[in-house]
Amino acid sequence: LALAIHRSGQKDAPVLFVNPGGPGGTVVSALPYYAALGLGESVVKAYDIVALDPRGVGASTPVFCMTDQERDQRNAGEDTDTADDNPQSAIAEVKEDSRSLADGCRSHSGSLFEHIDTVSAARDFDMVRAVLGQETLNLLGYSYGTFLGATYAGLFPERVGRFVLDGALDPTLSVNEVSALQMRGLDASLQHWISDCA
């Protein structure tokens, strides 16, 4: 796991974990931004800010899904859009492609692949909390970071400190349902923008 800490300068300052969402983006490399602009001076002076790249993300041990040669072959493949001709066929194609990609990730990443999930990420946060000598975990989570925070709270309710969860995801929705809602929202915004420009 890759970890970065921005020190407040105070001795024995409490720790604030930051997760900007994703999943899939690095937090470690974004820590200077959060410390300089994103959190506000009062927060940066009061807390040591911790950025932790979850397993498979950013500077943590990566997940490999294919060799360079396999990636080149995949990227050079025929790019056809069959959705207009036969939507059901296109859905089946995407599902098969996703299954194939997951199988490649599993075979190229070994046992790590089976532990790339939100529960494992929450457990990793708890391990780092303990290593840093903190009785509770303080978290600022955005988007997917809210789901990670809710998962942590479900696993370790007695260790929840101060949580700010902004832009919360509905944990009862599937990834497909979240994506569909997001697409409808983006489309509505685009239609309003087009209307304003007319």
Predicted regions and their residues:
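Gly/Pro-rich cap/lid or specificity-loop segments adjacent to the active site
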Residues: 4-198
